């Protein structure tokens, strides 16, 4: 059995070059495959390996206090789903082209899945989907605003052009796995939005927790 782990963590990594080298060597030694992205703002990726390899990888990662509380989700496969290992240095772990929007420094309020339905049932809430247009069309929560963006880097322009009048309203966002809406709320806080919330762990955690 192969264990697949999707993970991310926003945290300041001034030594990101050293962290990159350490994790690349670790994953190589453990014969893991998949993709890890590292930037000064944190880590994001999906990797796969044996149970022993994944346990060793996570234990080593969490031994660094900056990753002690890292969010990760496991799934399983009979065969290795990836062909190779890629551990890459990037400017951002989720591209927004807004490096000052750093969730480890300022971010919206996390909403647990169990509290989500009650929050979005408030008629005064402005519910915004931070996913790309094709994802939104697959399905979304009732009364969701679709920004109709093709890529996440277009989100800031959408907000500035369409949501500025709602800076004093309660803005609630969601995405697939939690990472984009964290970055989105960090940006919106910078823009002066007073009350910004996002679904912790995204739609995936909501489905596992509620349905």
Regions found by a protein language model. Name each.
Residues 1-109, 131-211:
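Rhodanese-like catalytic fold shared by cysteine-dependent sulfurtransferases
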